[in-house]
């Protein structure tokens, strides 16, 4: 089973070779399990974990994983899933490396009946599964003012047995377009429809390279100790006024494409050990963390960085998922994600976090993880993109796929920032055409003034 962490969708569409299986013996986890939320049933037997994606009108086989160690199963794309039974044998949990939190499991006696019957593959069947997948899992229709039932009534009459694949792809794309949710996508092979919040720009590799070159030439010309880490995804420099500049363009890809989470974590720790060395944090007067072009990745890697920025434990956020197909107001129990001070040198001084509309997904959960950080933390720039959830991959009977969020990330007061994004304390333009043309970086300049003049207080 693939549990897609909060990341750019294009990264999630790449698979890999299946891992080798170890000798298989029955385990306490063998059997059939229903997952709280997520519309998922799991079958575990003979060393194979098989996902079934369910709605009230369908059951389709999803991804599978092979047992590769005690309680661990590895998917074809290299994600390690850890399955545990809890208390008696009828409750359990599953966790994907790189994700934050567990998903609860309840043992059931057998697969639901629809999982044992052939699934029609005609366009109408695909439409019904597509619509129902959003109806039962998408949390934000009300907040976005979308009547999903009216959407069905408008578009279902356009679909019939002779509807072509191109026509159906266009229908699905039109249906989800008004959501303006960059964690929503329609996939048909290499063809993908996805879009972000209006007025924002996706954090592509090309934009990342352009911005990095701009910052190095404009802002870091006189910097010391300029260094790239983690396959170029992290950059650090000491600035002339005693501040540090830390640029993070994603929370993944640190050890190269396809590398397992453990390798990503090793590369991140290696970077942090250099950037936040004991000698440096003793003289650092302020730290700028630049997330303005950040395509997301692993929430857990963001928590790992936050653990190097505090001496006091605190809750980063709590995470919950829709848990009733018929009632969008019912959720799983909120599961807190904790920031625990790392057993390594830690920087606890003032921080300025730079964000914008190209701060996406795990870039946003990391921003949220710093909101209640003890000490002075200020956000400067523009609101983030407004997508936080892990991404559900839903297969359709005709071979297409739908991608959608079903989770909310809550602050201590129960607030979410889906749709609107996390707002800055201080608003500045971020990489507009005028900023590029005039070689200005207003957000970074504001961060320097705040840190140098006020030690992190707003101005």
Feature locations, PLM:
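C-terminal soluble interaction/assembly domains
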Residues: 381-397, 402, 419-425
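Flexible, low-complexity junctional segments that flank or bridge functional domains
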Residues: 3, 23-287, 291-321, 391, ...
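Cysteine-centered nucleophilic/redox motifs
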Residues: 175, 351, 359-373
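Low-complexity, Gly/Ser/Thr/Pro-rich intrinsically disordered linker/tail segments
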Residues: 418, 422-459
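Short, well-structured beta-strand/strand-turn elements
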Residues: 184, 360, 374-387
């Amino acid at each position: 089973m693939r549990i897609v962490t909060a990341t750019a969708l294009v990264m999630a569409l790449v698979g890999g070779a299946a891992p080798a299986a170890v000798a298989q013996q029955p385990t306490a986890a063998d059997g059939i399990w229903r997952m709280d939320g997520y519309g998922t049933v799991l079958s575990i037997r003979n060393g194979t974990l098989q996902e079934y994606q369910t709605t009230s009108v369908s059951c389709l086989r999803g991804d599978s994983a092979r047992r590769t160690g005690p309680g661990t199963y590895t998917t074809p794309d290299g994600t390690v899933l850890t399955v545990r039974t809890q208390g008696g044998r009828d409750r359990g949990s599953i966790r994907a490396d790189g994700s934050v939190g567990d998903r609860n499991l309840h043992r059931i006696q057998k697969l639901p009946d629809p999982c044992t019957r052939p699934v029609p593959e005609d366009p109408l069947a695909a439409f019904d599964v597509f619509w129902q997948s959003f109806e039962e899992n998408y949390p934000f229709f009300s907040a976005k003012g979308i009547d999903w039932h009216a959407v069905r009534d408008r578009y279902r009459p356009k679909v019939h047995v002779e509807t072509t694949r191109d026509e159906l792809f266009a229908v699905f794309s039109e249906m989800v377009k008004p959501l303006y949710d960059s964690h929503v996508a329609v996939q048909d092979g290499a063809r993908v429809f996805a879009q972000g919040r209006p007025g924002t720009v996706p954090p592509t590799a090309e934009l990342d390279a352009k911005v990095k070159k701009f910052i190095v030439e404009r802002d870091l010309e006189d910097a010391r100790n300029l260094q790239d880490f983690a396959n170029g995804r992290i950059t650090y420099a000491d600035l002339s006024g005693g501040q540090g500049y830390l640029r993070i363009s994603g929370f993944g890809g640190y050890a190269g494409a396809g590398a397992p989470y453990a390798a990503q974590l090793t590369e991140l720790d290696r970077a942090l050990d250099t950037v936040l060395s004991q000698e440096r944090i003793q003289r650092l007067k302020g730290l700028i963390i630049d997330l303005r072009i950040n395509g997301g990745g692993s929430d857990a890697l963001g928590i790992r960085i936050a653990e190097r920025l505090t001496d006091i434990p605190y809750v980063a956020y709590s995470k919950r998922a829709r848990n009733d197909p018929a009632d969008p107001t019912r959720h799983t129990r909120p599961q807190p994600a904790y920031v625990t001070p790392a057993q390594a040198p830690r920087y606890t001084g003032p921080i300025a976090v730079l964000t914008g509309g190209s701060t996406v997904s795990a870039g946003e959960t990391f921003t949220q993880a710093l909101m209640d950080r003890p000490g002075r933390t200020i956000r400067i720039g523009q609101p983030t993109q407004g997508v936080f959830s892990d991404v559900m991959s839903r297969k359709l009977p005709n071979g297409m796929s739908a991608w959608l969020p079903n989770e909310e990330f809550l602050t201590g007061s129960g607030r979410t920032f889906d749709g609107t994004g996390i707002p800055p304390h201080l608003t500045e333009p971020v990489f507009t055409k005028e900023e590029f043309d005039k070689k200005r970086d207003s957000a970074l300049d504001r961060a320097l003034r705040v840190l140098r003049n006020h030690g992190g207080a707003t101005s």
